[in-house]
């Protein structure tokens, strides 16, 4: 039995609130249960130096956690003077995932900067961030089209993400912190709205997992992401 009494395939309640802040071209508060992440998308003219003159755009991401998003306060990374390896890994994952969803040629020489700030953490912050950031990205692209900056929508498809893992010997979907911290296997899966894979990050924290367990985890992720995409679409309708 899971601590929350959810079934193995049951995700936490997911809520997406658009236009959460006033200034960003796209802004979303995404909630996976008690995990809450603010995602903003800023549309900027120009591209990084390595892309100048190539007629294509760029999507990049930054990720951070507020000092009291966790049970005990942690120092801001800015105060420590450097980002942790975890932070760098997560923001690269978010950026890679979102770039897969955008036609960079249609974006033109423009950049979209995604900022994901964890307000409250209870497991699955990176998957919640990807899910919310995708909706913020859609709003930023629609803003640019409304301003006449873009003539064609560069979005190829929606993407979403969910965590899966093996907890007490059983594959489960959307781990909260108490499950994540004790899981034998922990995996993060990013998919398109049609169920194609973008990224799979999986680690045996305890016992190695079998091929059959891997397939079970991917099936759980596909089911969970399908439900999350439906919530994304409802929020955008």
Swiss-Prot record:
UniProt xrefs under InterPro entries: ExoRNase_PH_dom1, ExoRNase_PH_dom2, ExoRNase_PH_dom2_sf, PNPase/RNase_PH_dom_sf, Ribosomal_Su5_D2-typ_SF, RNase_PH, RNase_PH_bac-type, RNase_PH_CS
Record's catalysed reaction(s): tRNA(n+1) + phosphate = tRNA(n) + a ribonucleoside 5'-diphosphate
Keyword Transmembrane among UniProt keywords: no
EC number per UniProt: 2.7.7.56
UniProt keyword Nucleus, yes or no: no
PANTHER family in alphabetical order: EXOSOME COMPLEX COMPONENT, EXOSOME COMPLEX COMPONENT RRP41
Protein name: Ribonuclease PH
Organism: Shewanella piezotolerans (strain WP3 / JCM 13877)
């Amino acid at each position: 039995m899971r601590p929350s009494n959810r079934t193995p395939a049951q995700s936490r309640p997911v809520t997406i609130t658009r236009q959460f802040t006033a200034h960003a071209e796209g802004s979303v508060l995404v909630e996976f249960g008690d995990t809450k992440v603010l995602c903003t998308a800023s549309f900027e003219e120009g591209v990084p130096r390595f892309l100048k003159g190539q007629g294509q755009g760029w999507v990049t991401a930054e990720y951070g956690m507020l000092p009291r998003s966790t049970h005990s306060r942690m120092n801001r990374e800015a105060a420590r003077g450097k980002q942790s390896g975890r932070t760098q890994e997560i923001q690269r994952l978010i950026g890679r995932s979102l770039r897969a969803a955008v036609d960079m040629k249609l974006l033109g020489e423009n950049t979209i900067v995604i900022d994901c700030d964890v307000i409250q953490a209870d497991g699955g912050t990176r998957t919640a961030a990807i899910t919310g950031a995708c909706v913020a990205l859609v709003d930023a692209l629609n803003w640019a089209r409304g301003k006449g900056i873009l003539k064609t929508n560069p979005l190829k498809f929606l993407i979403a993400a969910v965590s899966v893992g093996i907890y007490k010997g059983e594959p489960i979907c959307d781990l909260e912190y108490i499950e994540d911290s004790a899981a034998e296997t922990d995996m993060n899966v990013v998919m398109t709205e049609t169920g194609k894979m973008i990224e799979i990050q999986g680690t045996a924290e305890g016992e190695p997992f079998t091929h059959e367990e891997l397939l079970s985890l991917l099936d759980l992720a596909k089911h969970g992401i399908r439900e999350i995409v439906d919530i994304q679409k409802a929020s955008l309708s």
